[in-house]
Swiss-Prot record:
Residues 1-100 are annotated as: Chaperone activity. This is Nucleoprotein. A motif (YxxL) lies at residues 178-181. The lineage of its organism: Viruses, Riboviria, Orthornavirae, Negarnaviricota, Polyploviricotina. Changing residue 107 to A: Loss of homomultimerization. Its EC number is 3.1.-.-. The keyword RNA-binding applies.
Amino acid sequence: MSTLKEVQDNITLHEQQLVTARQKLKDAERAVELDPDDVNKSTLQSRRAAVSALETKLGELKRELADLIAAQKLASKPVDPTGIEPDDHLKEKSSLRYGNVLDVNSIDLEEPSGQTADWKSIGLYILSFALPIILKALYMLSTRGRQTIKENKGTRIRFKDDSSYEEVNGIRKPRHLYVSMPTAQSTMKADEITPGRFRTIACGLFPAQVKARNIISPVMGVIGFSFFVKDWMERIDDFLAARCPFLPEQKDPRDAALATNRAYFITRQLQVDESKVSDIEDLIADARAESATIFADIATPHSVWVFACAPDRCPPTALYVAGMPELGAFFAILQDMRNTIMASKSVGTSEEKLKKKSAFYQSYLRRTQSMGIQLDQKIIILYMSHWGREAVNHFHLGDDMDPELRELAQTLVDIKVREISNQEPLKL
């Protein structure tokens, strides 16, 4: 390991070399200005590379020097025979050893991790773009979301399309749509758009357009979303007209409508109206002015399509429509149910099976309630009792091969593998 003097001498030497290299770089830049031939350009590039390498090395040496000085200070500090740090408040040594020092200087308490998004500014930003680039980005982050996120994790990507541009001095320049691809350690700003936030706001603003283009996330596809929405108006009308077990039965047949799910939803709408937040109301008003397909009743042809791309919470534009946040929770439960079925039928230890289970519902519930509204669990129960069995019967469980066909194919595989090798055949 280098001594303190060696590192200091190294720093002095590199600083001298850097001064010389920078002077040579300036000379090369002047030479290119006077005669921009290939030789001068090549010399300029090599001079830049040399300066960059020296700056990098100098930075490393300075960090090494700082570490050595810190280590010397630590070594010279008197060690308490009790093993307790000088600023520790304990009178007796803890059974736990001292761990890492966590530096929190970089954390901004005004914008903590996991905060509620600024939906108004996010919504207005998205509304400022042409519809084609929004729908194409939605397709890339839902239908092809897994691949896009995997390839770009930890970066801030830009979507580009001919439909999105701005004119500067009469010249068209591309206007990019920015989306951040965070890692688990990333801290997102309130107005920063992540894939989850983008799917949430885009589906909430343009459900009719999502329906017209049949953009469905694979996560929703495997729980039979396409089948579920096929006769949506007929399905929701039958549901709203059904008898509600949470309302008292009416003695007069003429008042039967007062004991239906529709009557319960009307009461729920009055409760929701009292929970409205001004920012989201402003966003809804602006969205209507910008021709977004906003709806005020769950019994609308495109209402269910706000969940087509598996948003991680109820879109803010549908938050104040009775039954909509609960419908998203119903879909989240279906995702958990399917994953539980898949985990149950898989081979492995109980711990391995538990890892394959999911918590979509808990995540959805937490994120939606952070927007200022409490979900009505009774409505989720109504959805599950009316549509649960049918939905489960239309899950895609990834095992569509007939058992006899599988057995026959496996036999042929076994025979061929034994003919050409002495290895054990794999299972189909």
